[in-house]
Structures are given as C-alpha cells and as structure tokens.
A protein has these predicted regions:
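N-terminal secretory signal peptides that target proteins for export/translocation
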Residues: 1-7
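Sec-dependent N-terminal signal peptides of Gram-positive bacterial secreted proteins and lipoproteins
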Residues: 9-28
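Lectin-like carbohydrate-binding module/patch detector with strong preference for beta-trefoil
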Residues: 30-198
Length: 198
C-alpha cells in the first residue's frame, strides 16, 4: 500500500512539473509569431531572359569585363543564365543587379553611360547605380499572370534593354518586340506548373 502511495505522489509530481513546463506554450499575450524562412542560404533561382517568342536567350559572349551580349539559342553552359540580386526598392519598384552565372559579371551600360543607344555589356560589380535594373511587367497572359517584362535602367527608367543590330543597347522604351522579355526559370523552380484541363 505504501508503494502505491509513493507511485501516486511521483505521478502527481511528474504531472505538475509537466504542466508547469507546458503551460507557457499555451498562453497567448496577443503577439503573433512571424514566419521566417527555414534557411537563408537557399540557392537563388537562375533565370533565362528570352526574347518575346522565346526562340533565343540573352547570352554573354565571354566572361571578361567588356564582353558583348547577344541573343542565341540555348547552349549547354551557364552563359545564358542570370541571377537577380535584389538591391532595394523605391517608388519605381524593386531593383536588381542582373548577374551572369557563368562569369559573375553584371549587365552594365558601357562606361556606365546611361543614354540612348549606349551598348550594354558585362562588367564586374562596381556598385554603380547604372548597374541596377528594374524588371517591370508590361503584358499579361489570358489568366492575368505577368508574361512579358521590360528591363529598364535605374538611372533612367525611360531607357530599356533592347536587342540592337549588333548586340544589346539602351533605347527609349516603346514596347516593341525587341524590348519585351520572358523570364524563364533555368531548371526546377518548384512543384507547380500549367497543366492541360483536358
């Protein structure tokens, strides 16, 4: 009988300690916990910048400073893959550094000159404002999802990345096909996608 009383006391004490430990978990003081990412080092999604009909991809023609850019069919290396490094946001939207995955160099107006007809080339990161770009949706698909984008320079948002006759240039945005870009994921982006409702 004494043993049974000791067991009861031990169980009661254990239950009280367990309640004292769990009780703070169930109190609500009006504070809502914020959700955060599990990992902050999740790899950035690489993108392909495709022309309007998605037949060619913006590709770096080299890996050194001053390398030209052109539209080419997709190859087997990372010269056509781009990473969008967020720099900040303001009244015009969010702006990025567009980093080539093969070289680590940025989309840059030649000599940092942001003016009409300036060539756009690759150059190392200098944290110049002319190396910052807004990627702005301009047309949607039939479901209302953003489809075509213009890529305009931070220093002059009227100047867009434009396919010129011999490479990429800055030109006044007019909405022509050579200024419209598709943002296509380079590889697996997620688990969802369009499906046929057949």
């Amino acid at each position: 009988m004494k043993q049974w009383i000791r067991v009861k006391k031990a169980l009661l004490l254990s239950l009280i300690l367990l309640m004292a430990w769990l009780l703070p978990l169930f109190q609500w003081n009006g504070t809502v916990l914020s959700a955060t990412a599990i990992s902050t080092d999740y790899p950035a999604q690489l993108m392909h910048l495709a022309n309007k009909d998605s037949t060619k991809i913006l590709t770096a023609n080299g890996t050194s400073d001053g390398a030209a850019l052109s539209l080419q069919t997709l190859g087997s290396d990372l010269s056509a893959s781009w990473r969008f490094d967020r720099v900040g946001s303001d009244g015009n939207g969010t702006f990025f550094k567009l980093v080539n995955a093969q070289s680590g160099r940025l989309l840059t107006p030649r000599n940092y000159n942001v003016s009409d007809k300036t060539d756009v080339i690759l150059y190392g990161s200098e944290s110049a404002q002319s190396q910052h770009w807004y990627v702005v949706p301009v047309k949607q698909d039939h479901l209302g999802n953003d489809l075509y984008y213009k890529i305009v320079n931070y220093s002059d948002i009227s100047l867009a990345l434009t396919q010129g006759t011999s490479g990429m240039t800055l030109a006044k945005y007019s909405g022509t096909d050579n200024q419209l870009w598709l943002l296509n994921a380079d590889g697996l982006q997620g688990f969802a996608g369009y499906c046929f409702d057949g």
